[in-house]
């Protein structure tokens, strides 16, 4: 079992002061093996904070990030899954299923994690999985002014990925669970 925290679109300090205290109390060091971030941290202090939770931190650049060293997209393998990471402002139209599926094919990944819309989504599409963890701070976007803070915790175990979405609604943390299974690859003999 490998725990992967997926979050993004924090926009600190421009659109939000910090992560919600209820989220901060849940995100403790030593529990999570990987963090993947869809960008728009905006300041180095958020990067440093995430490193205290887990040193294995993968970040892609959002259009408001100060650190130009973050790549546009990134792929990594966790367990049996190949994950792709992209902020999403490059995908036109934003959040479009077919455009995201094309990016997923281009990256050759089982799970594509993208952001930019600030709205949580997770679905199977064209044989893959697309996840948007939303905005971890509830920062507004050009699409939506009223955003519930959210993040995703993935439990990857073999060919199974359980996606838990944590969303702060009316001051309470609500958790939903979605399970995805990757069919095992079979090799055919000569």
Swiss-Prot record:
Compartment(s):
Cytoplasm; Endosome membrane; Prevacuolar compartment membrane; Golgi apparatus, trans-Golgi network membrane
The question of whether Repeat is a record keyword is answered with no
Which keywords belong to this entry? Auxin signaling pathway, Cytoplasm, Endosome, Golgi apparatus, Membrane, Protein transport, Transport
Name the major location: cytoplasm
- The answer to whether the entry has keyword Ribosomal protein is no
Q: Which BP terms from GO are recorded?
A: auxin-activated signaling pathway; protein targeting to vacuole; receptor recycling; regulation of auxin polar transport; retrograde transport, endosome to Golgi; vacuolar transport
One short Pfam name that applies is Metallophos_2
Self-association state and partner proteins as the record states: Component of the retromer complex which consists of VPS29 (MAG1), VPS26 (VPS26A or VPS26B), VPS35 (VPS35A or VPS35B or VPS35C), VPS5/17 (SNX1 or SNX2A or SNX2B). Component of a retromer subcomplex consisting of VPS29 (MAG1), VPS26 (VPS26A or VPS26B), VPS35 (VPS35A or VPS35B or VPS35C).
As for family, the record states: Belongs to the VPS29 family.
Question: Could you identify this protein by its name?
Answer: Vacuolar protein sorting-associated protein 29
Read off the lineage from the record: Eukaryota, Viridiplantae, Streptophyta, Embryophyta, Tracheophyta
Q: Which gene encodes it?
A: VPS29
């Amino acid at each position: 079992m490998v725990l992967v925290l997926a979050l993004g679109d924090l926009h600190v300090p421009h659109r939000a002061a910090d992560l919600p205290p209820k989220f901060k109390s849940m995100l403790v060091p030593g529990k999570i093996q990987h963090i993947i971030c869809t960008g728009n941290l905006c300041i180095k202090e958020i990067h440093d904070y995430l490193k205290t939770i887990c040193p294995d931190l993968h970040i892609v650049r959002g259009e408001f990030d100060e650190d130009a060293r973050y790549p546009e997209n990134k792929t990594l393998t966790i367990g049996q899954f190949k994950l792709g990471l992209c902020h999403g402002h490059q995908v036109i139209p934003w959040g479009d299923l077919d455009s995201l599926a094309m990016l997923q094919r281009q990256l050759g990944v089982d799970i594509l994690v993208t952001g930019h819309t600030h709205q949580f989504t997770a679905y199977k599409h064209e044989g893959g999985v697309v996840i948007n963890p939303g905005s971890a701070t509830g920062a507004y976007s050009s699409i939506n002014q009223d955003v519930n803070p959210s993040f995703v915790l993935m439990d990857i175990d073999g060919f199974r990925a359980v996606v838990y979405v944590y969303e702060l609604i009316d001051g309470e943390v609500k958790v939903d669970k979605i399970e995805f299974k990757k069919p095992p690859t079979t090799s055919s003999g000569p």
